Every structure is written in structure tokens, then in C-alpha cells.
């Protein structure tokens, strides 16, 4: 807990302090600081090119290339997946990534002074992604706290993003899927995002897939 707080909070407070100092000196400097930090914390390019390249490969009939790109994106083997499964998993990854790299970052940017919220969310997500699921003796406690802290920080943004999906898509189906299907996912946040996103888009996500020769229920 202390290690996580020391890693996240000082940087967050320092970011806010720089914003206030620059704004006091010149509002334009504060604005430029906001823009710079927000630009660095947004990660649109970290997922958009994967999604675009995968769908382009599928359209060109290059299933092997699409499979390789998906495996690289997800960090696990995509061997055995057919074109339909690849497209579905790419959509799932894109929905979750759009939230974690764009929508949630912007929301926290708005909630806290200056760009401090955006930086806090990005740091929390970084530690969750790299240590949140580790259970070894050296990093296990840090990983567990990183996971819990990120879940708390992400609680409100997840639901706002899901509501946004519903508003811009099929509202009734999105809300219905959110209420009835999200609880089936082991990852609550991903379940809410994928259920509401699937309902809004009118597609089916979260179906069983074949990974490493075995059927994975999700």
C-alpha cells in the first residue's frame, strides 16, 4: 500500500502544483501544461492501430496476419481462432481500451485540478497492468493493492463510459445487457463495458473461444 501511494500520489500532487504555479504566472502556461500532460497520458494510438490493422487484414483475407496482430495486442496466443472470433475479440479489446486509454483519462482530467487526475489514472492503470495480477512473494502484496486501487479509481469512469455507450447506441439493449450480463464476467469493469458496448452496437460479445486447443468459457 505504502509503495503504491509513494509511486502515485507524489507525482499527482507535483503535477497539480506545477499547474497552479504556471497558471498563477500566466494562464496560457497553465493551459499549455494541461494540453501537454493530457496529450502524454492519452493512449489512443496504443490500441487504434491494432484494431484498424486487424480489420484491414481480415478484409484482405489475411487471417494469419490478423491472428498474429491480435496475439500481440492481447499478449497471449491467438492460435486456433477463426476470422469471426478474431473480429469479436478485437472489438472487445477496442471497447475496453477506448475506456482505459481515452474516456477514463479525460474524465479524471476534468474531475481533478489541472491534469493531475489524468496522470493519476494513467499511473494507477500502469501499475495495475504490470503488477495487478502478480502473486509472487516479492510483488504479490503490491500487485493486490494495485488491483484494488485501480478498481476503486475506475469505478465511476467505467459506469460513465457504459452510459455513454448506451446513449450513442441502442439505449434499451445496452442497459438490458449491462444489468443482466455484466455480472457473468470475472472482471466486473470489463463486464460492464463489454455488456453495455455489445448492447449498444447490437452485437454478441463474450462467447466461448478456443485458446491453445481448449475451449475457454467467458
Each model region followed by its residue ranges:
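Hydrophobic N-terminal alpha-helices or hydrophobic patches in metabolic proteins across all domains
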Residues: 1-218
